[in-house]
A protein has these predicted regions:
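Compact, glycine-rich, soluble single-domain proteins
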Residues: 7-57, 64, 88
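Extreme N-terminal starter segment of soluble prokaryotic enzymes
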Residues: 2-3
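C-terminal structural segments of small proteins and small subunits
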Residues: 54-89
Length: 89
């Protein structure tokens, strides 16, 4: 299993559009992908789970990937967060 911590730096945090991008990116990979906030772990391929994290700007999340393409999945998700979900803010 590969993990990496990221900090949400886009202005609105993990709102609906950002959550949708995260879920669709996670779904591109065979590996299981989880996102952890504090003690809450959710499936990153579940829009409801991701939205339930209610993560505002500045929140630190841990992304966990396990499976045959875990390296690629983790790299893609970390890049998405670091790119502010393409929002340019």
């Amino acid at each position: 299993m590969k993990t990496e911590r990221v900090t949400l730096c886009n202005r609105l945090g993990l709102h609906a559009r950002a959550a949708s991008k995260l879920v669709s990116t996670a779904a591109e990979f065979q590996s299981s992908v989880n996102v952890v906030r504090d003690d809450r772990r959710v499936n990153a391929k579940s829009i409801m789970g991701v939205l339930m994290l209610a993560a505002p700007v500045g929140t630190e999340l841990e992304i966990e990937c396990e499976g045959p393409d875990e390296d690629e999945a983790l790299a893609a998700l970390v890049a998405l967060v670091n790119d502010r979900f393409g929002e340019g803010e």
